[in-house]
């Protein structure tokens, strides 16, 4: 685990974005942890979040021309990541996002920001069923652009309804790499360093045994 990944876990714990306990997911599964990126909800949170996304992007080595944030949750992520890339990595890249409802006045259309073209890096909070990615792919392909990759904050590394994860489905269906700031494996490595969190470690390991990919 790299220093920025450890720092991200601590940031998420401090903001109660990441919690350990017993939670029922939308799928009905009982999970020993819960991640709610919506609680990154202040200016400082967003500034820090952008730095972690930018760090993971640079670390990945994936070449891309533009950041795309799917509405709605991807919009502030794309914006803050673009700022962080410019401020901390000297990479001044364009970004854009979609509207859920196309405008019929003013500049019109369903996109805001830069023209959607070239190699697109899609940024979002998490991938649950992959629905937002599929909707975004329709937009990207309609503009003649290509998907360079997808970056999310957390990869839960767990099976969907079948034998593979929603993330593996996206990688298979679109031939792109999905990267994340942290994975379930990183969470377990972090818990292993914290004796006072041993009860959570056992529960998370058991969950991975049952649902992991």
Swiss-Prot record:
Its cofactor is Mg(2+); Mn(2+). Orotate binds at residues 34-35, 128, 156. Pathway: Pyrimidine metabolism; UMP biosynthesis via de novo pathway; UMP from orotate: step 1/2. Its EC number is 2.4.2.10. Coiled coil: none annotated. One of its GO terms (cellular component) is cytoplasm. It is an enzyme of class 2 (transferase). Changing residue 19 to Q: No loss of activity. Changing residue 124 to N: Loss of activity. This is Orotate phosphoribosyltransferase.
